[in-house]
Amino acid sequence: MYCKWYLNLHLVCVVCKVYTTATMEGVMIKNFVFRTTILLGVISTAFAANLNTARIDELTGLKGKMNEKEGVYKVTFPRNDVKVVVGGWTMPPFMGLGTWAAFTPTKDGAMVMGDTVLFEDEVNAAMSAALDNGLNVTALHNHFIFDHPKVYFMHIEGEGAVDKLAGAVRKVYDATKQVRAASPNPKDSFGAARLSEKSSITAAPLNEIFGAQGESKDGMVKFTFGRPATMHGVKIDKEMGVNTWAAFAGSDDNAVVDGDFAVTEDELQPVLRSLLKDKINIVAIHQHMTYEQPRIMFFHYWGRGQAKDLANAIKGGFLVGGLLKVTSPLP
């Protein structure tokens, strides 16, 4: 498969060597930059030749476009099925409502990266489809404010065989289409039973599940677990914002849990899978800091159900990610 690539690389190296010996010392830096550009171009083109773009089109159901310079094949489509208004202005998809996935060849197959435009009721279906089919979800956030309906953007990444990656991308797109087919207009709620305005959560069972004493206030219960890290050489932990927390409100039989997980990059995907499996909605994935060690990702969640079931779902995320081993004790 790579014979052509190695041959091209060898020829370029020979040419570069001859070209170098024929130049004066004063222009060696310019020649080096020139030769490097040629070399990278040949490598990129040779790798791109091994990318089965026809198969990507077939599996994604889209017609892509190749960037020969970067060796990247990109498929895209506009989210023009739902009218989006930002600040009172109807926004054309060209202005930032385009879903895309870009493929670049690697020695083991390909890498895909992409951004998926989603409405609120599509988020968890699309995220589950991505994770269930071997893709990583690396961010979930908004690009606008005062947009209606609310628009979210889910970033994905994966490596492996082209067929597997393109097929996984198609699964994500199909998941959003299924949601819109069932309800052409995005929903404005989770559809769960109405919560009581006055909360009455029993703390004891939740304390037992988490193995910690929660903070109680007005019938609500909140648990906060820190994890040690450093930023700019300074130790930071729970009180400085490096924490996972879960807050419960409502009643024992009709409760809501919301909170935030602080996880490393290696922990992110398995914890997301665990919570989605237990019907916990993921509502944001992002960073809170820069230059921290280890790098910490934060994701926010929202769940409805019986309080104990919700607590067990959150604890399940702790167990899958190994977070119980790193959390700092509560006072």
Predicted regions: what they are:
Residues 4, 9-27:
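Short, Lys/Arg-enriched N-terminal segments with co-localized hydrophobic residues
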